[in-house]
Amino acid sequence: MAAILAIAACAIHAQQKPTVLRVGYFPNITHAQALVGRANGQFEKALGAGVQVEWKAFNAGPSAIEALFANAIDLTYVGPNPTVAGYFRSQGEAVRVIAGAASGGASLVVRKDAGIRNASDFHGKKVATPQLGNTQDVALRSWMRANGLKAREKGGDVQVIPISNPDQLTLFLKGQLDAAWAPEPWAARLVHEGGGRVFLDERDLWPDHQFVITNLIVSPKFLKDHPDVVKSFLRTHVELTEWIDNNQAQAKQIMNQQLQKETSKPLPQEVLDDAFSRMQVTYDPIRSSLLKSTQQAFDEGFLGRTKPDLSGLYDLTLLNEVLREKKARPVQ
């Protein structure tokens, strides 16, 4: 009898053990849903006591993808180019896009005293991106190609320097960088704190000023094993997207409080307002823009010799279930 009771107790304990959901994100306002949701505990409330959420912050996309490969995270907010690179490297086994998160929110910022007025002035300059192969890195290299510029490693004279966003600001202030292609709020910080100006708002390069800068992706294994958890997370993601869009002043205040926790100080209000003016939260993954950025990454040599087949990259089934339940238009 004692043995039976012990076995039963173990079974009950096993049933009560919470599912752990490890979520990646960046301390950027282009990851607004993660910042607001983490600050107010909305994901934890929606998922309930049966799910334990663990948050993991990254500087740029490739690091988040490596964590996904290493089974260190289950789901992450991340840019389109690392998403595609991860899908390609894993032969479609490690990545599924389940929603969009943000559109816009990236700019090419130049130092006011760097002598840059047009594209040809970038010859011989030092230009930073957050990380080799990340979304802004690919965008810069593609723009350079379109304007007759080449990086040093490809026989040109533009020095492209992959360096973290905080270090970009430091080097800007020291006059050791001429420009940077950066996501928000770092682009706005380079303007307001680093003596820079926006040379190019990336939205101007895209149809209808719409391009995906942040996706929500998941491990296919976690999606298969825990579809209920993923759907609940998506429902909250959609609700946060709608709330942020309709309550921008309050949302910016919450994001700033969370950014203070992440980066040790809040953003000045003018920086936050400027940064938010160049982006839009959305749960639409804007698939067409990802396909174009994939072509750009392929052209820049980040995806090998064979262009990847992305037919299995998206799984919007649960997102569209949530949208139908909310009587909202499904996305494609």
Where do the language-model regions lie?
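Stable alpha-helical elements in mature extracytoplasmic
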Residues: 30, 39, 64, 79-82, ...
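Secondary-structure end/capping motifs
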Residues: 224-305
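Short, low-complexity disordered leader/linker segments with a strong preference
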Residues: 1-20, 328-332
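Short, glycine-/small- and polar/acidic-enriched structural segments
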Residues: 16-162, 174, 178-184, 199
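Pocket-lining segment of extracytoplasmic ligand-binding domains
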Residues: 91, 114, 154-157, 161, ...
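Short, solvent-exposed loop/beta-turn-alpha elements that line the ligand-binding surface or hinge
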Residues: 41-51, 204-207, 276-285
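Conserved C-terminal helix/tail region of periplasmic/extracytoplasmic solute-binding proteins
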Residues: 295-332
